[in-house]
Amino acid sequence: MEKNKNNLEEYGTRRVIEPASVLPPSAWRLDNRREIYPDEIRIMVKRVHLEPTSFKQISLECGNDEAKMRRKILDITLRRGKLHNPVTDTGGLLYGVVEEIGEDYPNEKKLKVGDEVICNASLAGIPASFTSVGEIYRAYTQVEVEGYAIAFGKIPLIRRPEGVPVDLLLFAFNESGTLYRVSREAVGQKKILVVGNNIM
């Protein structure tokens, strides 16, 4: 895709289809085309951690029928261009493998094609396209998927730490991903304020 950048595009605004002039998490629908802009990165998604409220809502709506749950997840992604549950207004996290890196992507972590990564930002704001949903792991509210997602410069990607199971990593980052980022930023005598609910 061509370069045509303004200062909000590192947050993914050019991927917004509707409504116009909002950030991706607030959009109803995103452009999830596979081709990337020069400052984007594409990830081959292998597993998704659904936010627990979303997982429960989908499960109840589908009568705990896993075939229906798979179709529902695919339907949400097809209609919205992202895995953003319209009932609960929540997303989740993803794990996958770096597939392509744009030439202008701000690659501070020096990621390479083939690196395993966890996206430490909600799927509510990330363009994604899934072709299939596989195994469902109810204990962790996670599903195996085949497909891809597009990340922007301001989306935090974390190289998978060795020796820790993916299901536990996704679960932990879903619960305390902000604290992980704070641990990297809170150096010296910096003052950090964490605002949220259900922290304890």
Where are these regions (language model features)?
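N-terminal intrinsically disordered, low-complexity, charge/repeat-rich segments that act as generic
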Residues: 1-26
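Short linear interaction motifs
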Residues: 21-33, 78-81, 94, 177
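Glycine-rich beta-strand-centered segment in the early N-terminal region that forms part
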Residues: 34-49, 61-124
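NAD(P)H dinucleotide-binding glycine-rich loop of Rossmann-like/cofactor-binding domains
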Residues: 92, 116-191
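Residue-level detector of alpha-helix initiation sites
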Residues: 177, 198-200
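Conserved N-terminal Rossmann-fold NAD(P)-binding element of oxidoreductases
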Residues: 192-198
